């Protein structure tokens, strides 16, 4: 087999019949599979050993040769080669067809490639292929032209003969009629008898005339058809074709079925056709030009690749290896077989029957029918169900054809190539492990011994506990005591990977050092739950074991949980104290007035602790303590304080204890710490300290949090839910107000909608008042309020539902039900209240289920479009960048920090020197914008910064590190080789489930829903035209408005005096857009001035319009802004750079308008880098460059338009992409991740990128000298510890045997 790491591209093309015969090891002639008595394959059948190889290793069919020593011999009795049985997975056979058949992919795909090539409509093509019409394949025009007069004369003679015959017959009939009438007259017959005879005679004469006329018409038609006969002409009338053939057979050839298509293809002149089409495109207009463009795509593909078009018609069909379509015996003697075997059997049966019919010389009609059936059976084999009804197996199930094996989630690509199962894994339920360090996990002993079995066995043999591997295995299985000691030793420092499904982002798999635990549950560190989105209500996790040294190193350095504290999406810590820990730290840092020991002073922390232990001092009492090891913050710092000096802190003992958890030089924190403050401190630590310190501090915070949460006595009981005593009075007051509204409604003073709106107002106010009363009524030390105030769990609205009132609930449409639920959960709901509150809640659950599926599909498309965005170089050297605001100057001269600095400017690189108002450089070009740098800029009064962005990056492939900026997950400049595209896709997809599905009814837009949440994100990324789109101004100018009863009409009079731009029929259901004039907002009116790209109506703007009017940069920024809007509204912080990576992929292509001297086809999408490169080449050679316009592609379309056919085929529309790729002879350069995963190469990202793979070790001078010293070892084999102990000389690397070839 070819080693996968040694090829750089993969090409796909059309196979000709010769190729198929070359691959084949023999022809399959019989439909038999295996002999049901002997269970051995039948000779010449679908499982034949002679063709495909032996079923048992080194054994021929008849048993003459058995054993490996006969390797390679072909048995003279049965003809089977003696070799390994696994060749049955790679050897192919073939079926020689008795008649050609077309390949259904090329004839039936949309658009039909065969139809485009031959310029035949798919309908006509189908008629020809399935024997419903004849097609003319060639016409000898010269011979026809030369002999035209002779032929015409012959036809003339024939016409005359028919006319003469007709006249003679009519004459005879007329005479007979006269004689009959005369005879009747003599006999004196009645008049009606005479009339009848006369009418009968006339009728017969009419028939004679008609018959002759029909014959003449037929002659005319035949002659007419013959004179105009052209190749590729269809003749549906069989009689007409027969007549033509009988009369003029030597002047043309024709036929039906795939053979005639093959004849057409063989005579087809690709170059001439291509030139003609190019001419049509140059000179043509409208439909003609469009059709020529589409045809040229197919024709040019054949021209460029030199593929032979007759490969689209098959004379033989390949048979895939039998072990890929196995047949297995079930209990009870029945067989289960792959559907392919049934499909192949139908082909072989029909083919054999056709051969027999042809040999017997059967009539044409019967043979044609059999040929049609053969065509249909080959169609079903390739793509069952593409044409007509699918072939079904038992139970009416459509059989799975070759195409179905590749398609969809269960197809080869997605099931087996992109997602493989791994050995060395286990799974179990998780429980919390509060005693673990951040980088540890608890692994159940039994699971560990199974996972590490080979390691344990080897070590048992090394330590002479066992004689050989077999006895070591027995020891492990019997769980002898020595096994546990060895296991401890083996797992030390050997990380394992833990994964929790669904793995929505890269933190869903992290590495830990295992600690052996009793029981059967995996223990997980509480701080990594957030990243895994895990809880301990029965979640399960999988364990995987990295085996090779490289894998272990990567797991330890890149994936260890203590190195993954920051979120790759926002760059902020994910490992935060949560739940109990928050409560504990909150309790620890509270300060209570009047607590025991308040106002005392202590000479040292130790003294205070002693007082606390004796019960003389409360944890939360305000005291003064002399501290030595802590650093005072700005407020507490004495005038002349030097580091290391003691100072007097006015604080509580709890806060001193808290500060002892933080790094030594961290300024003293003297505040109450709810969750937000704790998060800010962890954030600050992550910005200022190395990861190791942060991890250690987090562990200390976790331990302290649990310790003090236990001692805080926070518990929840029903008596903690205190209902405010004045609740009924409050509600009675509002009940009266509601009655007033009802009265006004009954009197007709309010409409139904107004009444509802009024009631909603009344009851919302009631709920707020009850909530205030409830908060005021809660005791200071109430557990529930403590949990909420500390930010550990829950929020005030939930407490209001528990202790205040449930309030208004909405129905599934999202409208409020105007009757409130007055009860709370403490008092209990009535049946009606319970029912209406359930109504909306159930909708919420159904919504979540739908959202999960939608969000998963969005992530998949995002990954697909961005998978080949990898950091390929450190700096692309571009001067371009994007200006971003970091602050706004207020009228009083103060700076107001921009709300979105966190997600826009933070973690980027400056694109130019940043100067203050005096021109002093505050930050040099290329500086990293972390929190300290941004603080510095704000202090210097800077409001806008020009930053590097992936949108302006000029790297040809992927992006460069400086344009991307800081990697959010490490806090440093991103490494070359980082797969930033996939990180971006995960960061956007992972919070997808949190986005709402609902479309909100917004006031003012009657009946029009404004799309928000997940559907809006999809609409943006797919670049769809939004529902109710808002027009934008094409040019700056004044506007003139006209107002009809149903529509607005807006006209823009451009400033530059060009012609007016009219926007007609703008629906009045959309309000006019707001503009701000002199700081006040109002709607646009007649005579206002608008800028280019300004919205004229409210609603969403069409991104394609933005691209057309404002250009690509604005379109990109617009998409980033709009996507961020949705995520921010849900409180999700994702950095802009992730959205930018995706948007960059959407605008990578240019549509060719005019191809100039290049090879591009007009109307085809081309990668921008390719377009620019080709233009440079053409201009250098003195030709005209191509012109094109940027085009915005949705992510699905962009994925399918990727250069890599492997990646596109494994995404969607597999057959269409493979069809196209084969015609174009597409070659996959294997640059993205997916292509390499599919063929099993290391991915070109991270440690697999070329510049890391091609590193060579250069020995130092000393090592070189030592290499030739006399070695001090006896045997030729060195144990690995030789290297560590310094015995002997350095080992020459060239001689050292690593067990496999690393070079």
UniProtKB/Swiss-Prot annotation:
Top enzyme category: transferase
Entry's Gene Ontology molecular function annotations: DNA binding; DNA-directed RNA polymerase activity; magnesium ion binding; zinc ion binding
Highest taxon listed in the record's lineage: Bacteria
Cofactor(s) needed for function: Mg(2+); Zn(2+)
Residue numbers binding Zn(2+) 2: 876, 953, 960, 963
Keywords: DNA-directed RNA polymerase, Magnesium, Metal-binding, Nucleotidyltransferase, Transcription, Transferase, Zinc
Pfam families according to UniProt: RNA_pol_Rpb1_1, RNA_pol_Rpb1_2, RNA_pol_Rpb1_3, RNA_pol_Rpb1_4, RNA_pol_Rpb1_5
The protein's Enzyme Commission number: 2.7.7.6
Cofactor note: Binds 1 Mg(2+) ion per subunit. Binds 2 Zn(2+) ions per subunit.
Catalytic function, reaction form: RNA(n) + a ribonucleoside 5'-triphosphate = RNA(n+1) + diphosphate
Matching InterPro entries: DNA-dir_RpoC_beta_prime, DNA-dir_RpoC_beta_prime_bact, RNA_pol_asu, RNA_pol_N, RNA_pol_Rpb1_1, RNA_pol_Rpb1_3, RNA_pol_Rpb1_3_sf, RNA_pol_Rpb1_4
An individual GO BP term: DNA-templated transcription
Residue positions binding Mg(2+): 535, 537, 539
Positions contributing to Zn(2+) 1 binding: 60, 62, 75, 78
Disulfide bond residue pairs: none
GO cellular component term of the entry, any: DNA-directed RNA polymerase complex
Protein family: Belongs to the RNA polymerase beta' chain family.
NCBIfam families, per database record: PRK14906.1, rpoC_TIGR
Subunit comment: The RNAP catalytic core consists of 2 alpha, 1 beta, 1 beta' and 1 omega subunit. When a sigma factor is associated with the core the holoenzyme is formed, which can initiate transcription.
Function: DNA-dependent RNA polymerase catalyzes the transcription of DNA into RNA using the four ribonucleoside triphosphates as substrates.
Protein name (Swiss-Prot/TrEMBL): DNA-directed RNA polymerase subunit beta'
Organism whose genome encodes this protein: Saccharopolyspora erythraea (strain ATCC 11635 / DSM 40517 / JCM 4748 / NBRC 13426 / NCIMB 8594 / NRRL 2338)
């Amino acid at each position: 087999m070819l080693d996968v790491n040694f090829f750089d591209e993969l090409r796909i093309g059309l196979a000709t019949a010769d190729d198929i015969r070359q691959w084949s090891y023999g022809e399959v002639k019989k439909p038999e599979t295996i002999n049901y008595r002997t269970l051995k394959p039948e000779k010449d059948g679908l499982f034949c050993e002679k063709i495909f190889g032996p079923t048992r290793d080194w054994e021929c069919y008849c048993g003459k040769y058995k054993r490996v020593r006969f390797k390679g011999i072909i048995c003279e009795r049965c003809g089977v080669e003696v070799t390994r049985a696994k060749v049955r997975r790679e050897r192919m056979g073939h079926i020689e067809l008795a008649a050609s058949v077309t390949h259904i992919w090329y004839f039936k795909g949309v658009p039909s490639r065969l139809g485009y090539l031959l310029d035949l409509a798919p309908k006509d093509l189908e008629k020809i292929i399935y024997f419903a019409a004849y097609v003319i394949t060639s016409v000898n025009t010269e011979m026809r032209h030369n002999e035209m007069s002779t032929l015409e004369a012959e036809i003339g003679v024939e016409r005359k003969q028919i006319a003469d015959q007709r006249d003679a017959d009519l004459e005879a009939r007329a005479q007979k009629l006269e004689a009959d009438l005369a005879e009747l007259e003599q006999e004196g017959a009645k008049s009606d008898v005479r009339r009848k005879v006369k009418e009968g005679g006339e009728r017969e004469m009419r028939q004679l005339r008609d018959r002759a006329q029909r014959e003449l018409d037929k002659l005319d038609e035949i002659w007419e058809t013959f004179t105009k006969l052209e190749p590729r002409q269809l003749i549906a009338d069989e009689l007409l074709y027969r007549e033509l053939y009988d009369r003029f057979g030597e002047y043309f050839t024709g036929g039906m079925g795939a053979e005639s298509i093959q004849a057409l293809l063989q005579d087809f002149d690709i170059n001439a056709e291509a030139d003609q089409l190019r001419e049509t495109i140059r000179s043509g207009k409208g439909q003609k030009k469009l059709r020529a463009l589409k045809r040229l795509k197919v024709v040019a593909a054949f021209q460029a690749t030199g593929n032979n078009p007759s490969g689209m018609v098959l004379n033989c069909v390949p048979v895939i290896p039998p072990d890929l379509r196995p047949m297995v015996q079930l209990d009870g003697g029945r067989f289960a077989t792959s559907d392919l075997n049934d499909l192949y059997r139908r082909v072989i049966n029909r083919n054999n029957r056709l051969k027999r019919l042809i040999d017997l010389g059967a009539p044409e009609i019967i043979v044609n029918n059999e040929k049609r059936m053969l065509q249909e059976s080959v169609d079903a084999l390739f793509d069952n169900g593409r044409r007509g009804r699918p072939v079904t197996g038992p139970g009416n199930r459509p059989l799975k054809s070759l195409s179905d094996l590749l398609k969809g989630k269960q197809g080869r690509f997605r099931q087996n190539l992109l997602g493989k199962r791994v050995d060395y894994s286990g799974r179990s339920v998780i429980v919390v492990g509060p005693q673990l360090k951040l980088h540890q996990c608890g692994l159940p002993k039994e699971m560990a011994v199974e996972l590490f079995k080979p390691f344990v066995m080897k070590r048992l043999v090394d330590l002479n506990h066992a004689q050989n591997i077999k006895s070591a295995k027995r020891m492990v299985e019997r769980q002898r005591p020595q096994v546990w000691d060895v296991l401890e030793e083996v797992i030390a420092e050997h990380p394992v990977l833990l994964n929790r499904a669904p793995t929505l982002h890269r933190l869903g798999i992290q590495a830990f050092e295992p600690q052996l635990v009793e029981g059967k549950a995996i223990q997980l560190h509480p701080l990594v739950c957030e990243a895994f989105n895990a809880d301990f209500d029965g979640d399960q996790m999988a364990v995987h074991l990295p085996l090779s040294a490289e894998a272990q190193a990567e797991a330890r350095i890149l994936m260890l949980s203590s190195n993954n504290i920051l979120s790759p999406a926002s760059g902020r810590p994910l490992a935060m104290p949560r739940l109990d820990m928050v409560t504990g730290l909150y309790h620890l840092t509270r300060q209570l007035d009047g607590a025991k020991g308040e106002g005392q002073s202590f000479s040292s922390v130790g003294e205070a602790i002693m007082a606390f232990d004796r019960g003389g001092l409360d944890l939360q009492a305000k005291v003064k303590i002399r501290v030595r090891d802590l650093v005072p913050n700005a407020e507490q710092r004495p005038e002349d304080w030097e580091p290391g000096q003691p100072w007097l802190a006015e604080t509580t003992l709890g806060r001193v204890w808290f500060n002892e958890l933080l790094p030594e030089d961290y300024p003293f924190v003297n505040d109450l710490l709810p969750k937000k403050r704790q998060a800010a401190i962890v954030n600050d630590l992550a910005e200022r300290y190395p990861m190791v310190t942060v991890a250690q501090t987090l562990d200390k915070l976790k331990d302290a949090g649990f310790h003090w949460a236990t001692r805080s006595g926070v518990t929840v009981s029903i008596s903690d839910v205190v209902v405010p005593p004045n609740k009924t009075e409050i509600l009675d007051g509002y009940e009266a107000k509601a009655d007033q509204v009802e009265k006004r409604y009954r009197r007709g003073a309010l409409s139904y909608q107004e009444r509802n709106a009024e009631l909603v107002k009344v009851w919302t106010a009631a709920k707020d008042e009850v909530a205030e009363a409830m908060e005021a009524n809660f005791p200071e030390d109430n557990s529930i309020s403590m949990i909420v105030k500390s930010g550990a769990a829950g929020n005030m609205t939930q407490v209001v539902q528990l202790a205040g009132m449930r309030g208004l609930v909405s129905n599934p449409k999202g409208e409020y039900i105007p009757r409130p639920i007055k009860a709370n959960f403490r008092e209990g709901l009535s049946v009606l209240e319970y029912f209406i509150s359930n109504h909306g809640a159930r909708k919420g659950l159904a919504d979540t289920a739908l959202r999960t599926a939608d969000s998963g599909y969005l992530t998949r498309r995002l990954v697909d479009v961005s998978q080949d965005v990898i950091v390929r170089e450190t700096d692309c050297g571009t001067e371009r960048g994007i200006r971003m605001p970091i602050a706004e100057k207020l009228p009083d001269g103060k700076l107001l920090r921009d709300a979105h600095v966190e997600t826009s400017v933070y973690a980027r690189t400056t694109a130019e020197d940043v100067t203050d108002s005096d021109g002093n450089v505050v930050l040099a070009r290329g500086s990293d914008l972390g929190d300290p740098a941004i603080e510095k800029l704000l202090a210097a009064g800077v409001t806008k910064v020009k930053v590097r962005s992936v949108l302006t990056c000029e790297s040809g492939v992927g992006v460069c590190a400086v344009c991307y900026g800081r990697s959010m997950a490490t806090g440093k400049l991103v490494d070359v080789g980082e797969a930033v595209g996939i990180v971006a896709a995960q960061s956007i997809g992972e919070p997808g489930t949190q986005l709402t599905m609902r479309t909100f009814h917004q006031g003012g837009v009657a009946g029009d829903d404004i799309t928000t949440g997940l559907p809006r994100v999809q609409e943006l990324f797919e670049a769809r035209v939004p529902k109710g789109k808002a027009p934008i101004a094409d040019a700056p100018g004044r506007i003139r408005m006209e107002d009809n009863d149903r529509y607005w009409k807006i006209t823009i009079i451009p400033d530059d005096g060009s012609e007016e731009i009219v926007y007609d029929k703008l629906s009045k259901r959309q309000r006019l857009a707001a503009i701000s004039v002199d700081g006040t907002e109002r709607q646009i009116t007649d005579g206002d001035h608008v800028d280019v790209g300004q919205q004229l109506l409210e609603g969403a703007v069409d991104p394609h319009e933005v691209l057309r009017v404002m250009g690509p940069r604005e379109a990109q920024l617009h998409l980033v802004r709009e996507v961020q809007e949705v995520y921010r509204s849900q409180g999700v912080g994702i950095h802009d750079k992730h959205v930018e990576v995706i948007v960059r992929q959407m605008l990578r292509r240019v549509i060719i308008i005019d191809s100039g001297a290049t090879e591009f086809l007009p109307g085809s999408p081309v990668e921008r880098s390719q377009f620019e490169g080709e233009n440079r080449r053409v201009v250098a050679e003195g030709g005209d460059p191509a012109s094109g316009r940027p085009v915005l592609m949705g992510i699905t379309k962009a994925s399918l338009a990727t250069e890599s056919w492997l990646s596109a085929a494994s995404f969607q529309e597999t057959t269409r992409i493979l069809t196209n790729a084969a015609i174009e002879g597409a070659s996959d350069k294997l640059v993205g991740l997916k292509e390499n995963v599919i063929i099993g190469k290391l991915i070109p990202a991270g440690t697999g990128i070329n510049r890391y793979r091609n590193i060579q070790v250069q020995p130092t001078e000393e090592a070189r000298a030592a290499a030739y010293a006399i070695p001090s070892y006896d045997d030729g084999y060195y144990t690995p510890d030789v290297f560590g102990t310094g015995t002997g000389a350095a080992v020459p690397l060239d001689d050292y045997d690593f067990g496999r070839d690393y070079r």
